[in-house]
Structures are given as structure tokens and as C-alpha cells.
Amino acid sequence: MEEANNHFEGNMNIQQVNPTGVNNINKNNKKVELKRKVTMNHYINVTLDNMGFTRYHLLLFLTNALFLFCEGMNEIIHIILLSMIDEKHDLSNYHLAFMNSIEYFGYSISTLLVNYITNLIKRKYAILISVFVSLLCTGLSITSFNFIFASINRFILGFCFGILDILIYLNLFESLPTKIRGFVSTMILLFFPLGEFALSLTCYFKLKEGQMEVNYKFMLLFPFIFTCIICLSAIFLQESPRELFFGKQEYEKGAESFKKINEFNRDESNKNKFNFGDPEVEKAANDISIELGIMPNQDNHEAQNENEFQDNIKDNKNIQKSLLRQESNNNIFKMARLRQLFSQEFLRYTLLFWILGSFSGFIFYGIHFMLPATAPKINKNTFLDLVLFESMEIPPNFFAMLLIENKGLGRKNTIRAGFIITFIISLINIYLGETILLFDCLLKFSLTIPLNILFVYSSEIYDSHIRTLGLSLMNFWKKISSLFSPFFMSYILTKYGEFSTHLCYAPLLAICAFGSLFLSIETRGRALDEIIILDK
């Protein structure tokens, strides 16, 4: 590991040096940096692909699945809690709207802070603390039904969920082999609607009239038990090697993380060991660098340049000062990544992800809010309605799992097709001139597919050093829009009627469909952290 650290530090220490003149400094610096990045990334990808899907990946998968299952159940529990507090205190519509939104507000705040939090402490510690606090909040939910207490409790719970949503997912996502990354990442998202569906079904069969408080406490047992299991499993999680290498530039700790993962897998084979000195991997990385034009096709060219660079360091005080500034910049780089999202490479995708995430989130939760308004025409039983509504999110998740790795469609074309089809369904509904439950269901069905794949696609586009920030900010805009969606839809519903909501959906869906055409990079089957480099 010490050799690994020295290997890459040696490459980084020559970034500001050039013996031939000022005009070539930036070009050579960029080539050395790209060569270093491609080489290191190739080592990581070879190691992960050789590992396959191991016991450690299963631990990550089950932890993520249980968390999303719990989060889904908490959505239904929130509905029961609102009904119960309203029954006890006869709340106004303002108070109901406030409490309905407070959890989403906590979630939104935490998505803004999650990158800052992971700069201060390890991901593992952030996950453990958030799981433990959410466990306390779930337990305390049993004891009191006071409006203020319940609001604070739901805010804290939403705050923890916002952190866990990003970090648990990324720990799994960044460790997956390339071939199954999209399939597994999309499969995980299935467990949120499954949690909603399972608890809604349980409520339908088990809840008794006139015993709402007893029923509520009984239902809280399920997320409480599952959260206890998540807390135990989180103890065995390791830091993401990719985050350590690229996000924090801690190369020795990254290699140590690979070692601990192999120990957890009880794997003694050489193929899964992270070995910087593997000549085959080194040669493959060099071939990639030559193909990209990062380095010339000369075996000793880079070694000669390194010797010349190091000789210049000893004789040039300005170069030494430049290296010190570079080291200082690396230390503050972790706190200034927002600018990277708006760099030339990522600007288009950052803006598109924010627009697509916020608009589709607004529409999705608007449909979620509107469905209960049309469902009573079919069935008056609340939880049976919820069973039907939540079941609509399950089939499109299976479609997303199949389509995301399809050679003909891939990520970007599936997102495009999903938004275009959803827009067409909205136009048909407008043409018919009335709100039909079937079309609302189809709208929710078709929108779920691009929304889920967009989550995976954005994670693949961003490099590791800005992935947490990029994904959390997209989630922030999505959650903020979903927070205001019920208020806006309630106003539209009251003032203009049910059908008017579709007049709001159509233009937003048109923007999403048009915007998705500018997603030019296909990420299927491609290694992380080199997608943007290869498409420059």
C-alpha cells in the first residue's frame, strides 16, 4: 500500500513542472493527470470486475434494500399518523399541509448538506449515525401524538433519510462490476414501492376500526425491527474504495478498503487483490492512454520526462512554490466542488439533471397526490386504494431493470422514450377532455421508468469526486418540487377542477422530453470515472 501511495504521489508531484517552457506546461500537466487518472481507474475497474458479485456486495444490496423498504413503509405510516393527529386535534388544512411537507423539507435540507458531512466524517460513520437517529425517531413515534413533537420527529426522520438515500446507494453503486451495475442499481429502487405496497396491504387486512392508536403502534414495529437490522449490517460496511481514491485522494486507505472487502469475502485468490504493480493492468492502462492521445507510443518517454521534471524541481524555486500551491489547492478542493458541476465537461448535464429531476418529481408527486381524488369513484376503502396505487410503481421498475442494460436502448434512449411516451399519454388525456383514473395510472407507470433510470444515469456521468454532490443536488431539486407539488395541485384542483392538472403536466413533460434529447453520452457497459474523459 505504501508502494501504491508513492506510485501515484510521484505522478501527481510532477503536475506543475515542465522543462521546455511555459507554453507546454498546461498541456503536459493535463496529460500526466489524465494518464494518472486512467491508470488508477483501470486498476479499480479490473479489481471490481474480477470480484464479480460477492458476499460483500450482497451485504450492501440487502442493507440498501431494507432501508428503501423501511422508507416506503414510513410513507404509509406518515399517512396514518396524519389521520390520527387530525382526529385528535382537529387540525386546520394549513397544519395538515405543514405536517405533510415537513419530512420532505428535512430530506431536502440533508441532501444539501450530505457532501459537506462526508467531507468532515467518513461515509460509514454518517450512515451509522443516521441509521441510529432514525431508529430513535421511529421508537419515539410510539410514545406521543402531539402535533409539535410529531412534526419535529418527522423532520429529523426526513433529514436522516436524505443522507441515507444517497450514501447507502452510492456505496453499492460504486462497488458494482460494470456489466451488472445498471441492472442491480435499478433493482434496488424496486424496494421503495414494495415497502409501501406491503404495509398498505397489511393495513388493509389488519387494521381495526376505532383502534387507530393501537394499529399505529403495531405498524411501527415493522420499520423499527428492519431499522435495527440495518444498524447491525451497517457496522460491517467499508468505505467505498472509489470514493477514497478519487473523492478524497487517500490512496493507501483505498487499497486498505479493498483488502478488508476481500477479508469479508474470505477470498484469498490473487485475482481479487488490488495490485498496483500488475504488469498486465499497467500495460492495458498505457494502451488506453495511447489510444486517447494522453501519452505518445514510446515505452520510455514518460520515464525520461519524469527524470527531466524532477531535475528541474531541484533547480527552480518557482516550481517548488507552484507545487506547494498545488498541495494547498488539493486540501481545499474537497470544499469547493460545486464549481466542478458547472465546468465545461459537466455544465450541460448538471442543468439537465436539475430540470429533468425537478419537473418529473413535481409531476410524479402531483399524480401521487391526485390519484386519491379520483380513486373514491372506484373504491372508498383508503388502504385498498393505497394498495392499488402503490402496485402501479412495481411493474415499471421491472421494465426499467430490463431496459437499462438493453443494447438497443441503453440508458439515454430509455429516458428519452419514457418522457416522450408520458407526454403523449398526457396529450391523449387532454384530448379526451376529462380525468380518467386509467390514464393517471398509465402516466405514473410510464414516468417511473425514466425517473428511476435518470437516477442511475446521473450517478454514472459524474466523476467520483463530485458524484455525491451532483446526485444530492439533483435529489434536492426533485424533493423541493415534490414538496410544493401538493400545495400547487390542491390550489389547481380547488379552483379549476381535476382535469386542469393535466394542462400543467403536458408543458412540463414536453420540456422533459425535449431536454432528454440533449443527453448525448451512453453510459451502458462503460467504466466509471472515465466516461467524460473518453467523450471529450
Language-model regions, residue ranges each:
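Transmembrane-helix signature of 12-pass secondary carriers
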Residues: 2-21, 26-259, 291-296, 319-536
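Long, low-complexity inter-transmembrane loops of multi-pass membrane transporters
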Residues: 17, 27, 260-334
